[in-house]
Regions:
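N-terminal donor/sugar-recognition subdomains of glycan-related enzymes
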Residues: 1-216, 223-240, 252-257, 267-280, ...
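Long, contiguous hydrophobic alpha-helical segments, chiefly transmembrane helices and signal peptides
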Residues: 61, 65, 75-77, 244-245, ...
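Short, composition-biased local secondary-structure segments
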Residues: 215-225, 310-317
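Catalytic or ion-translocation cores adjacent to nucleophile or general acid/base/metal-coordination motifs
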Residues: 239, 243-245, 253-297, 305-310, ...
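Active-site/ligand-binding-proximal alpha/beta "capping" segment
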Residues: 292-357, 361-363
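Active-site gating loop/helix substructures
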Residues: 300-327, 383-411
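Acidic, contiguous segments within the catalytic cores of piggyBac-derived transposases
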Residues: 348, 368-384, 403-412, 416-417
Length: 476
């Protein structure tokens, strides 16, 4: 949080107070309340709206805003400057600070803000967010406030995307969950070791947190994987290779993953494993993943659980009971992307500070393809070519709602709304992680810690030469 030796000074004037801080008046010297009251009087607030109140300082306008809010709308006060926060909490009416429709938070951390915001909106329906700057204090941390607004907007959007996904796929998720859970219970009953019945959780596999002590590379199936293959081959023996389901077939046999992450709930994912179901490679599977495929795979299986029910209070309470009774495996936030799930798993598996590389997480199209040329999706396209069926159909060449967005290294990336949303989730969850390194040379701009292959190799070399302790402040 922004702090300094300078203190904000209250300046008495005829109609109240202004604040002098860092050489600037944060309110008008003539009528400090006039501007904000005019804004609140003129603004239209729809139902199910969150109002982001930036730098409220003396609280002018908050009372009028809360009176104007629809019954199903709320206000979030945000202050990033420590000195202004102290002044603000002393000057704002306690009735406002204690109002159930208002949350006042002081932080300059997006992660802390989103955590407090998530707690605040539990059980509430928020469809949109609007921003109101309550004082000149908004200009002191303009970049952070803009970022906060963008992240909150994206957060709300993700909530509704999850709800729509649940409407479309919820029945399938639930069916798969109970089929897989029942299969685990049956394995307990058939086990000669009856003591396992006393600990159902042990049958979810050996997914032990902080159990990997080698640098991890998460391999997605995006186009950037193609340029990373040689690097992975050269350093294979020094890496823990965690591959997503769609990339597995293209890697094997030259690169045998240490584990494969399976997330997909629909039957089509079985195509990605044709001819490779009996390789005895460990599988880390979501309990909602396709049960028919899980039965065919003969590798050791560990399970995790994607919290797809977070927006459904009844289902969420059911899973909470399972968790309390310790009969639910590792629980992850619903992200919708197997690549993001693999990153979350890698973070759980790794010792603190262990380097985690990733490639193939482009969240965009490459030259003609949405996936790596090694992926089963691209191989499937080529296998379907015939005299009367070309490589590209209209929909595959020009998918619906594609757009150009900012790509890595100043380039443009061709992406879709869903892929762009995954990219925004990456920014929220992983972009700020010091030990995460992006070696993918193409794709959507993720604000990730991008490095080239030489730098990645140096990090690995340093890890082994320094006994597992490395300086994470590398530049490409």
């Amino acid at each position: 949080m922004t702090a300094n030796n300078e203190k904000p000074e209250l300046i008495p004037i005829d109609s109240g107070f202004s604040v002098l801080y860092k050489g600037k008046y944060l309110y008008s010297k003539r009528s400090p309340q006039k501007n904000i009251l005019q804004v609140i009087s003129s603004i239209v607030i729809q139902s199910e709206t969150l109002v982001l109140c930036v730098s409220p300082v003396l609280g002018y306008g908050l009372k009028e805003l809360l009176e104007k809010l629809p019954t199903d709308s709320f206000a979030l006060g945000l202050e990033a400057d420590e000195e202004l926060l102290k002044l603000s909490k002393n000057k704002i009416d306690k009735n406002i600070l204690e109002d159930s429709k208002f949350l006042y938070t002081g932080t300059d951390s997006i992660n802390i803000l989103l955590k407090q915001f998530d707690d605040f909106i539990k059980g509430k329906k928020i469809r949109r967010v609007i921003r109101i700057d309550f004082s000149g204090g908004a200009a002191l941390n303009q970049s952070f406030y803009s970022q906060a607004f963008d992240f909150i907007s994206q957060y709300i959007s993700q909530i509704w995307i999850n709800r729509l996904t649940l409407i479309q796929f919820g029945r399938n998720y639930a069916r798969n969950f109970f089929k897989n859970y029942y299969s685990i219970l049956r394995s307990i009953l058939k086990s000669p070791d009856k003591s396992s019945a006393l600990n159902i959780n042990s049958c979810f596999g050996s997914l032990i947190e902080k159990s990997v002590n080698r640098p991890i590379i998460v391999i997605g199936a995006g186009p950037s994987l193609d340029s990373s293959i040689e690097f992975i081959k050269e350093n294979r023996d020094r890496l823990f290779v965690l591959a997503v389901d769609a990339a597995f077939a293209g890697l094997y046999p030259e690169i045998r993953p240490d584990a494969v992450v399976l997330l997909e709930s629909q039957y089509w994912i079985q195509k990605a494993f044709i001819g490779i179901t009996d390789l005895d490679i460990p599988i880390i599977a979501d309990l909602t993943s396709n049960p028919s495929l899980l039965v065919k795979l003969n590798g050791n299986k560990s399970f995790f659980f994607t919290d797809y029910s977070a927006q459904d209070s009844v289902a969420s309470s059911f899973f909470s009971v399972l968790k309390e009774k310790n009969i639910l495996p590792l629980r992850l936030e619903a992200m919708g992307s197997v690549g993001l799930a693999a990153l979350a798993l890698a973070e759980r598996l790794a010792f603190d500070g262990l380097p985690i590389f990733h490639t193939g997480l482009d969240f965009s199209w490459g030259q003609g393809f949405s996936h790596s040329k090694l992926s089963y999706q691209v191989k499937n396209i080529f296998s379907d070519i015939s005299k009367i069926k070309s490589l590209y159909t209209g929909e595959s060449l020009f998918p619906n709602k594609l757009s150009f967005e900012k790509g890595k290294n100043g380039s443009l990336a061709f992406t879709s709304p869903n892929l762009k949303n995954y990219g925004e989730l990456y920014k929220k969850l992983f972009a700020s992680k010091e030990n995460f390194f992006d070696i993918g040379q193409s794709g959507l701009e993720l604000n990730s810690k991008k490095i080239n292959f030489d730098t990645a190799k140096k990090i690995i070399d340093d890890f082994y030469s320094c006994g597992g302790v490395v300086d994470l402040n590398y530049e490409a």
